[in-house]
Every structure is written in structure tokens, then in C-alpha cells.
From Swiss-Prot:
Keywords: Toxin-antitoxin system. The gene is mazE4. Forms a complex with cognate toxin MazF4. Residues 77-100 are annotated as: Disordered. The lineage of its organism: Bacteria, Bacillati, Actinomycetota, Actinomycetes, Mycobacteriales. It comes from Mycobacterium tuberculosis (strain ATCC 25618 / H37Rv). This is Probable antitoxin MazE4. Antitoxin component of a type II toxin-antitoxin (TA) system. In M.smegmatis neutralizes the toxic effect of mRNA interferase MazF4, its cognate toxin, on growth.
Length: 100
């Protein structure tokens, strides 16, 4: 029999959204274990899980965009290989001066 969890998001003391989630027994048990591990409520654990997954998705999207930029311009973030070489030469000279 499915287990229902009511979720409500509170932002600045104002109820933003609420929903009911249907969990199978295994997922319900996992949620209870997570809550016992230090969350103040099942709602807090679920909100945290959503936020962590969103951050991971966002990182994946940024990585994909970076890979596309590198594919289009192997010298990225520089406009050209000449600009990249000039920047490296300046950096190397600066490091040599500061090491002396």
C-alpha cells in the first residue's frame, strides 16, 4: 500500500507550494532513515534532495555548455591560440619575477 507524504515549501514565512507524494514501502523506509539521520522532518529531507539533484543537473548543464564551447573553440576561454600563448607567456614571466 502506498504511503503519502504531504510536502509544503515555506519561503520567508509564506506558504509557497504544497503537494502530496506517493511513496512505495522501500522509499518510505529510506525517507524515514534519512530523517533519523539528522533532518528535522521528511519535508526538509525531500526539499534538500530536490535541491541537491537540481544542483547536480545544473552542473551537468554547465559541463555540457563548456564542452560545446571547447568543441567550437579549442583555445576557450581565449579567442585564439595566439591570445592563449600570449597570456601564458605573461603569466610565466610574472611567476619568474615573483620567484626571484
Amino acid at each position: 500500500m502506498p504511503f503519502l507524504v504531504a510536502l509544503s515549501g515555506i519561503i520567508s514565512g509564506v506558504r509557497d507550494h504544497s503537494m502530496t507524494v506517493r511513496l512505495d514501502q522501500q522509499t518510505r523506509q529510506r525517507l524515514q532513515d534519512i530523517v533519523k539521520g539528522g533532518y528535522r522532518s521528511a519535508n526538509a529531507a525531500i526539499v534538500d534532495a530536490i535541491n541537491k539533484r537540481w544542483e547536480a543537473l545544473h552542473d551537468e548543464q554547465l559541463d555540457a555548455a563548456y564542452a560545446a564551447a571547447i568543441h567550437d573553440n579549442p583555445a576557450y576561454p581565449y579567442e585564439s591560440e595566439a591570445e592563449r600563448s600570449a597570456a601564458r607567456a605573461r603569466r610565466n614571466a610574472r611567476q619568474q619575477r615573483s620567484a626571484q
